[in-house]
Amino acid sequence: MSSGPASTLLQAQVGPRGSAIPRDPAKAAAAPPVRLGDTIFTADDPAAEWHKAGHHTVRVFLRKGPWALIWYLQAASPVDGKPFDVVVVERQRWNNLAAETPAASYRASVFGRDYALYGHGDFQRWVAASRSWPVSDRELNRWQSYGMLLPWGIGPKLQAPSEWSYMDPVPDYVPLDKGGLTPGMGTTGLRDEVGPIVHRQARYIMERSAEMRRVSMNYGLTAASIPWHVRGADGAPLLLDTPNIPLKLQQYYQNYPEERIISVSPGMQFDWDIDNAHRPCPSLIPALLSELHPFFVEEQVFSACAVLNTVTPDYRGASGKLVDQGQGRDWAWSMRDLLLAYALLRSMPPQDWLPEVACFDAILVANLERAVKALGVPGMGQLGMFWEEDAYDSEPNPTFWPSIRTGQRPGVYTGMIVNYIAYTLDWGRRLHGDPRWSELQTAFAERFQARRFLASGPFCFLNLPARLEGRWFSDWRQMAQAVGLPADIARQPWHAFDKPVNDPRVYEYTTEYPATFYHGLKLAQEAGANSADVDTAIALMEAQIRRGDTDSYPAFAMRHSR
């Protein structure tokens, strides 16, 4: 082993655990001594090989025993040309990283600046902070020992967990009618959970430094991703259903918490990702409330970019195989993210660091064409591309056994996938304008939606995930005050949205599900659908909406969300 405090530290980590970390004497002898406070690497060396080659990325291996540090250094963002102030450092290792518990800190000079370098074995990630880190190594160790996740890139307001007012336990279930939205509300723990963004999630998103946001955006657009100029064999932009196996994007994104669309929160026992979060959209509402503030538009665009990076199921192969429930959900949420990014970019002047709205439009059109073609595939069941291959649901759901009793295939959309798809199709019809949205929405309502609604029996209303955006709105009102957005944002009135079903305007501040569910059925009825199921479902919903008096959709949703 090389001499110096770093080697002593490594030995101390390994010693009490025996031979947990295999040692390579040759590599250890070749490794230079690294001490606390040493300058590991200077990136602005004009004679450096990476600089002469004109590469954006350089990997520098700092050998210490059987592991290495890999520095991903980019002098400037290919997106906006501005130099990065945050450098992401990845640590790779060939054995179990859990054996190394203490955190180590060094100083590094990058791009002519000095940074504190912090890392932790359990996270396989090192971050060179562009500002002083307000916690000690001992505090970092305490975070890990208590099983708390490190909030990489959280920005200048980072505090120790003991100082975080919203660092309270996340229960498995908190009823939504017990006191309304609170910072510690957490999630219901059910598969039909669709929001809201809890206070700590909003804090994490909003407190990310500007440098970290630009780094994340750069990941979404260029680094190990699908750049906008990449085309498929047919000359069209890559579709959502194009497998990207060579890039191994799923594995790539799993290891980088700060690159998830909505990253993990300290204290939360699960990760919000595209497979289990049902994709709440935290950026659309504040973007509208702040009159398209670039911060929130960028967040929504990054979410859409990450969709292109991470959603890789083969929706329509040569064999015409069925698509399972999870892929149907991913299709709905992915198209929604692309749709919202398209709508926001269309409504604001072009920005140098954001892709053009035409990129999202082309991808939406290509995937709509694929979905419409799926309608004509024989033997594909209801709508073809939306079907569940597994005869079970990962969580108990009251629609499961009713679907058995009504003779449907066991487990068909036992979750809320039917509502997610209905929601996405309704918003696509209003925001994008492509006539294929209406074609898909009408076909989906006629072939599947009404029967799925009626099959849930007495649960048909209780099981609608009627989470009003109003619950998000109260949170964003608090967030607007916390981050210093214009005060009138917090005082804007709530917009009623019981508009005609054929109203082309957008529902400005809501993503409420019962309305979108109802609209699809109503459109199918007006299009001449000769279906008793559609007529019955509409009659039931209208009776519920008008129960006692003529209620608006918000009142209807609020009543059934409890």
Model-derived regions: residue spans:
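Solvent-exposed N-terminal domain segments of exported/luminal and surface proteins
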Residues: 2-35
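Catalytic cores of extracellular degradative/oxidative enzymes
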Residues: 22-28, 35-41, 45-562
